[in-house]
Amino acid sequence: TKRVTGDTILYNLLNLKQVTFEVTDECNLKCKYCGFGEMYTGYDIREAKYLSFNNVKPLIDYLCELWNTNLSDSSLPITFFSFYGGEPLLNMDFIKKTVDYIEKLNIRRKILFSMTTNAMLLDRYMDYLVEKGFHLLISLDGDRYGDSYRVDKCGHSSFERVIRNVKRLQTNFPKFFADNVNFNSVLHNRNSVQ
């Protein structure tokens, strides 16, 4: 077996492809198949915790300092700062502070931003996400029936709202949509490919 050494850790930090922040464990949906949902027992309880900028600033500063040394072996590496949840758009204040801070740093590498989202709040924040060039991974399990496990906290389907927000994004920002938007689906008994 290969031992992890300080040099191995340093090499991996210098060549980091992605930094992912769990922005919040809170979600505005209650998907039936979620690991926090009704089909599972013995899971961690969601506590509606929100990540604060003050908690991630030291990490960002450390990585920036490290990446700006001459130790990096790549001419212009690309690193994604990714936002995940729960539903990350529920903590948009954190996302904006983090993105604004990173953009002000003089980091010697290409920085991109990405997010996995259920798109329920996309209508509120799409202008900002487009302006910052976010790469979006939108969770959608298919048509209305295929997406029927993805419900809000009252048990109502999220499908209509998500589709409306996705179509609005596609209509208002067609190039962004073509270049920066992908979809993530959970295969299950209502949408699985046979």
Label every PLM stretch briefly.
Residues 3-125, 132:
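Conserved alpha-helical substructure of the radical SAM core
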Residues 90-194:
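Conserved AdoMet/S-adenosylmethionine-binding subsite of the radical SAM
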